[in-house]
Amino acid sequence: MERVTHFEIPSDNPEQSQKFYNEVFGWNYHQFGNEPYWLAFTGAKETPGIDGAIMKKKHPQQPMVCSISVKDINASIKKIESSGGQIVVPLMAIPGVGWLSYFKDPDGNIFGIMQDDKEAK
């Protein structure tokens, strides 16, 4: 069974959002690369839960997205399409991290799928 392992919170003002979630929940952040994208650390590794990110919104209606870790992203894409889902962001490499794609389920909810692969380029 594959699990939700990451979330992304889009924000018009990422710094304000970081401050809010830090003050309310104690989350800490680290900027990832040169993009306006900050990894959010929500607790100690031994504590149940998932980490995520706060990112600058790319468009006004950008939804919050949860991502699911998969073992074989190409097989997952085929299953999504054959089960009535739609790929909305094609497969792309996150260099040194893995492979990522976004899909819409039959109800219109958007999720990410991620396959770890340190060799991704």
Task: Give names to the regions the model predicted.
Residues 46-51, 108-111:
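Short, charged/polar, Gly/Pro-enriched secondary-structure boundary elements
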Residues 4-12, 57-81, 83-121:
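Vicinal oxygen chelate
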Residues 2, 8-49:
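Core segments of cupin and vicinal oxygen chelate
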